[in-house]
């Protein structure tokens, strides 16, 4: 089933299979070098001291470049509560926008299995399938995942993509596509009530050309400001797949850019606070902004209110909210993750997750997806340089 819907008017050549070890100076940096932005404030990252390898994220078909990390909120189908779902953006040839697999890691048994493999050429999804960081599992057991497809690994052949609905056994049951969906990109923010839910997804593909289209002023691919954040309000009938009741563009005007090494840059991290403020990372501008009344607003807030900019942020990507209401955001330009107090706007702490000296700066391009662990004290993250799932713990 494909659902098309009109708009309510008013966002990485990565290191595929190259196995690199963090040793020597890099290991020392990983454990010792953390940057304090404020000595007075304490946060979650200051308590993190261990980084444990859990599993490879490469399935039998050879897909690489793990993106999304999602912790299962319930047991349903083949999934047990607290299982960790990870998807891949690249295929065995390391072409971006061609990954089709989702893996499931079970912390209780340390077992990893293939949860879903979606056909790469899916006619209802414009351009096919290339799974992104935009993935969630609802309390009703349904999985929703974004596709930003390509045929040559660059945005020159990018399709508009879609959102795919899977059941709890990994079967594809519905496709959502339409004029407001174009490269669903960043980690989803969700407000889930069981029989209905609200999703927030960044769309980073509108007007995007290939990386060969260069801005003569910058000598880089041209930057456009057409990326949006889309809110989908869903109803979830008992025993049936979710249905879209309404949809609203709650933010727009974010910077986006094609990139040969990174596929694209665009808004990536989304986190929803209890007061219904939606926080968004804007990597190109190295900032985090706030969208007020995100669950109820009927128009776009533009880019929203600036929360923090620059300093420890270096191409901020995926983001989570801690139990204390702080934001933790992974950097794309180095291997650090950064903690921010969104109320004061203070950047509290930066912590090395990946200090691989093979990149410059260390860890450049190695981090992406992140998810809070059920204990609220730890978090899962993926390392793209060695295609792995890890956990950071006290």
Positions of PLM-derived features:
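Surface-exposed loop and turn segments in beta-propeller and other repeat-based domains
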Residues: 41-61, 108-129, 165-184, 235, ...
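Beta-rich, blade/repeat-based domains predominating
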Residues: 58-82, 97, 119-143, 149, ...
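Short loop/turn segments immediately following the C-termini of beta-strands
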Residues: 89-91, 147-150, 158, 192, ...
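Structural signal for beta-propeller blades
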Residues: 94, 102, 163, 208-209, ...
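Beta-propeller blade signature
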Residues: 99-107, 159-170, 223-235
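Short loop/turn segments immediately following beta-strands, especially the blade-tip
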Residues: 105-109, 231-242, 291-299, 341-347, ...
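Loop/turn-rich, solvent-exposed surfaces of beta-rich toroidal or solenoidal domains
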Residues: 283-287, 308-352
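Blade-level signature of beta-propeller repeat domains, shared across WD40, Kelch, NHL, RCC1
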Residues: 366-394
